A protein has these predicted regions:
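DNA breakage-rejoining catalytic core of tyrosine-based enzymes
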Residues: 21-47, 96-110, 125-129
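Short, basic (Lys/Arg/His-rich) helix/loop patches that form interaction surfaces
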Residues: 152-208, 212
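N-terminal DNA-binding recognition helix of tyrosine site-specific recombinases/integrases
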Residues: 1-26, 70-73, 114-118, 153-163
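Short, charged phosphate-coordinating catalytic segments
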Residues: 65-86, 204-208
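Short, leucine-enriched amphipathic alpha-helices that occur as contiguous helical runs
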Residues: 46, 57-59, 148, 152, ...
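Catalytic-site neighborhood detector that most strongly recognizes the C-terminal catalytic loop/helix
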Residues: 94-96, 210-228
Length: 228
């Protein structure tokens, strides 16, 4: 997947970033470390994170997170039967009026459904089996989907290997607020939905992509409670 093919380009790197509604801070980069705020993740950075995944399963997981802007729990529920020619069928966790959503893929991700089905065929997955399965089996001996924690770990470790980091909004094991920290899945969702709004000016499209019952404009600015 070439980042330049993505039909929805992210905000250019180096743009002023907004950590809150009152002030702006410039993106910081260095030879050893470079990091950006959530809205500053560029297609190059996203592609670097995806390429830093250590296996095909993890690369496909990161590609789906980026292409769909879906919640981690929604992506982990993906099965071979949910993969269609130009869209993916995902559960909609937060909208009781629409429990399933069709997420159409941008032109740059046109090969993603085929890649997912090849992965499923190579591993002999049944139509109802989770595509992103763990090495551990379920109580019935069947394949078990990766957990949310495992998915976050996969993306964070790939981000560290790619040396793509963001400014932390609160303290973590990676350091104090304002210190560089690895990217995480929620940032892919923020960046994708925000980028659709900015590049297309199509609020209904962003609303459908996110699976919202209404467009939450406040969601497009990351707050402290939405950081790690």
């Amino acid at each position: 997947m070439a980042a330049s093919q993505d039909s929805h380009a992210l905000v250019p790197a180096g743009r002023h970033l907004r950590l809150d509604s009152r002030r702006e801070v410039r993106t910081v980069r260095s030879a050893q470390k470079h990091w950006q705020p959530p809205e500053g993740l560029s297609p190059h950075d996203v592609q670097a994170v995806i390429e830093a995944a250590t296996c095909e399963r993890d690369r496909l997981l990161l590609r789906v997170l980026w292409a769909t802007g879906a919640r981690v729990s929604e992506v982990l529920a993906l099965r071979p039967m949910d993969v269609q020619r130009d869209h993916l069928v995902l559960p909609n966790r937060k909208n009781p009026n629409l429990t399933v959503k069709r997420v159409y893929l941008p032109a740059g991700q046109a090969d993603l459904p085929g890649a997912l089905l090849i992965w499923a065929n190579e591993h002999g997955l049944a139509p109802h089996t989770p595509l992103f399965f763990s090495r551990k089996h379920g109580p019935d001996g069947g394949l078990k989907a990766l957990s949310r924690v495992q998915a976050w770990t996969i993306l964070k470790e790939a981000s560290e290997r790619a040396d793509v980091r963001v400014l932390a909004l609160r303290a973590s094991r990676h350091g104090a607020p304002g210190e560089p920290a690895p990217a995480h899945p929620h940032l892919f969702r923020h960046a994708r939905v925000r980028q659709i709004v900015r590049s297309t000016r199509n609020s209904p499209l962003a609303q459908r992509q996110a699976g919202w019952s209404r467009l939450q404009m406040a969601y497009l600015t990351v707050g402290d409670d939405e950081a790690r």
